[in-house]
């Protein structure tokens, strides 16, 4: 593309967000740019003592319908859409007595913010902008002749362009792309909201008839899951791990993000102070402690200290100096927490490569999706909120009711097993995992792996959780032989009676939840 700068002689400004408007208007006025504006924007500019032409004066038609119609007029849109490279367009403008615009500055009604505020349906509908997107799209389409600006963050660029003879063709193209993304995001937000309103009234399904998402490129990553795969990070509208603040360390990798997401979610599954250590999206250890977050970290690390080497650590509480000193002794890829005690970051930063992140708590509602060939699978997030996740609703199927202390361990184990890839068996004792068997294609092998990871001493007297039912008694029998005292599992197998009989025979307490927590 050639430079092809277009000097800015005439500008159309219509903004809901008045941030930076004063400086922008003054800069345009200094360069003798004619300003046409609407409603409250025109009033604000006039208050500054800057000449401004109200749009109704331009069109000869008054603003009407409570402001719904202001700029939807040929006198406005012809000035935006005229391709000044074409003699025929210039001739028609002259015949119609319409002057072209070289700059259009528009931002839109705050629809998303209105929805987020809890406003009623009619109030939200009133914030659906019509004229604004029309002007933005028109200017973006005609970027060979017009520069379009949709964010106050670009006002300094406008001031610079005024000094250099206008925006270049390449700059106008970039601004046009931003503008189309802006209106696309706006339309997706409106369409998604409308679909959700309809779904809420549909007795047959809770899912909207249309799903749209918008994500913006944050940065390219060094590579993907493997070095031969390219990768990038895109961010959405909901704040979370992707927007985490990094205090120290190398750039986050693709695998760092996937493991950190698993760790962050695992830690926040628990209401008590919790630390989760994750490797390849599976727990090396999870622990809770009312004593201190440092104690939780010690117990989580003790579960599988070998696998924890090079893992990701997530804490659902502030990282203390004591915990930071412990982590600093271990090779760790990432540590993530909601906050850090004064001095903790400095201690952790002594390790050159550790990535230290601070993030907001993960969203505890909504849906999650997974791409498949030709489509998208969408499901409600598994948030440990099923009826069977409450121990008050468990059924005692075998053995005697356990003590409050043992029940607390069973509750912990049941919550923790959600974060383990299926088939999953998790052993726990005193609020900490002691053995985890994950990702096996049969449950008996997961049981063997969990027992093997725990070792005979730690397995004895521990409790166990299974993410799904035991299809045969053999998986349970592995646990019973290892000295497990109580088991919590969903139940629902056609061989439940055989499994329960085996539990009674072994003298092991068994609770059935009626809820399942597969994770694939």
UniProtKB/Swiss-Prot annotation:
CDD domains: IMPCH (cd01421). SUPFAM superfamilies: Cytidine deaminase-like, Methylglyoxal synthase-like. GO terms for biological process: 'de novo' IMP biosynthetic process. The keyword Hydrolase applies. Pathway: Purine metabolism; IMP biosynthesis via de novo pathway; 5-formamido-1-(5-phospho-D-ribosyl)imidazole-4-carboxamide from 5-amino-1-(5-phospho-D-ribosyl)imidazole-4-carboxamide (10-formyl THF route): step 1/1; Purine metabolism; IMP biosynthesis via de novo pathway; IMP from 5-formamido-1-(5-phospho-D-ribosyl)imidazole-4-carboxamide: step 1/1. Keywords: Hydrolase, Multifunctional enzyme, Purine biosynthesis, Transferase. GO terms for molecular function: IMP cyclohydrolase activity; phosphoribosylaminoimidazolecarboxamide formyltransferase activity. Pfam families: AICARFT_IMPCHas (PF01808), MGS (PF02142). It catalyses: (6R)-10-formyltetrahydrofolate + 5-amino-1-(5-phospho-beta-D-ribosyl)imidazole-4-carboxamide = 5-formamido-1-(5-phospho-D-ribosyl)imidazole-4-carboxamide + (6S)-5,6,7,8-tetrahydrofolate; IMP + H2O = 5-formamido-1-(5-phospho-D-ribosyl)imidazole-4-carboxamide. SMART domains: AICARFT_IMPCHas, MGS. GO terms for cellular component: cytosol. The IMP cyclohydrolase activity resides in the N-terminal region. NCBIfam families: PRK00881.1, purH. Belongs to the PurH family. This is Bifunctional purine biosynthesis protein PurH. The gene is purH.
């Amino acid at each position: 593309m050639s430079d092809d700068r277009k000097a800015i002689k005439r500008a159309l400004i219509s903004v809901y967000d008045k941030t930076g408007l004063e400086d922008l208007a003054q800069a345009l006025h200094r360069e003798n740019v004619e300003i046409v504006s609407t409603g409250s924007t025109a009033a604000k500019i006039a208050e500054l003592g800057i000449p401004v032409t109200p749009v109704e004066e331009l069109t000869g038609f008054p603003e009407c319908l409570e402001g719904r119609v202001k700029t939807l007029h040929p006198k406005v849109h012809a000035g935006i859409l005229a391709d000044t490279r074409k003699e025929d367009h210039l001739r028609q403008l002259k015949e119609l007595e319409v002057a072209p615009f070289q700059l259009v500055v528009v931002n839109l009604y705050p629809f998303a913010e209105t929805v987020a505020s809890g406003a009623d349906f009619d109030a939200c509908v009133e914030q659906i902008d019509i004229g604004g997107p029309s002007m933005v799209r028109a200017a973006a389409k005609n970027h060979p002749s017009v520069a379009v600006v949709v964010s106050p963050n670009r006002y300094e660029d406008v001031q610079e362009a005024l000094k250099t003879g206008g925006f270049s063709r390449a700059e106008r193209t970039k601004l046009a792309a931003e503008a189309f993304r802006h209106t696309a995001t706006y339309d997706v937000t409106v369409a998604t909201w409308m679909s959700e309103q309809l779904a809420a009234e549909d007795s047959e399904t809770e899912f909207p008839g249309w799903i749209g998402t918008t994500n913006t490129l944050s940065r390219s990553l060094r590579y993907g899951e493997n070095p031969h795969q390219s990768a990038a990070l895109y961010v959405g509208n909901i704040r979370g791990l992707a927007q985490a603040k990094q205090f120290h360390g190398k750039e986050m990798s693709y695998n760092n993000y996937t493991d950190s997401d698993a760790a962050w979610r695992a830690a926040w599954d628990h209401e008590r102070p919790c630390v989760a250590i994750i490797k390849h999206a599976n727990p090396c250890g999870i622990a809770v402690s009312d004593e201190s977050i440092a104690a939780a970290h010690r117990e989580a690390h003790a579960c599988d200290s070998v696998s924890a080497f090079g893992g990701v650590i997530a804490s659902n509480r502030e990282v203390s100096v004591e915990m930071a000193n412990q982590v600093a002794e271990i090779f760790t890829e990432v540590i993530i927490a909601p906050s850090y005690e004064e001095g903790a970051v400095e201690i952790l930063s002594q390790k050159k490569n550790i990535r230290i992140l601070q993030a907001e708590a993960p969203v505890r509602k909504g849906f999650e999706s997974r791409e498949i060939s030709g489509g998208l699978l969408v499901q409600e997030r598994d948030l440990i909120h099923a009826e069977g996740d409450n121990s008050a609703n468990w059924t005692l199927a075998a053995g005697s009711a356990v003590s409050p202390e043992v029940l607390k361990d069973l509750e912990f184990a049941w919550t923790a097993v959600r974060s383990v890839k299926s088939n999953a068996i998790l052993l726990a004792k005193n609020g900490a995992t002691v053995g985890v068997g994950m990702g096996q294609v049969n449950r008996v092998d997961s049981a063997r792996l969990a027992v093997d990871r725990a070792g005979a001493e730690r397995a004895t007297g521990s409790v166990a959780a299974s993410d799904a039912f035991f299809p045969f008694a053999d998986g349970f029998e592995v646990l019973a032989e290892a000295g497990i005292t109580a088991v919590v599992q969903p139940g629902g197998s056609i061989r439940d009676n055989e499994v329960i009989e085996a539990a009674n025979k072994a003298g092991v307490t068994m609770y059935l939840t009626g809820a399942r927590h597969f994770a694939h």
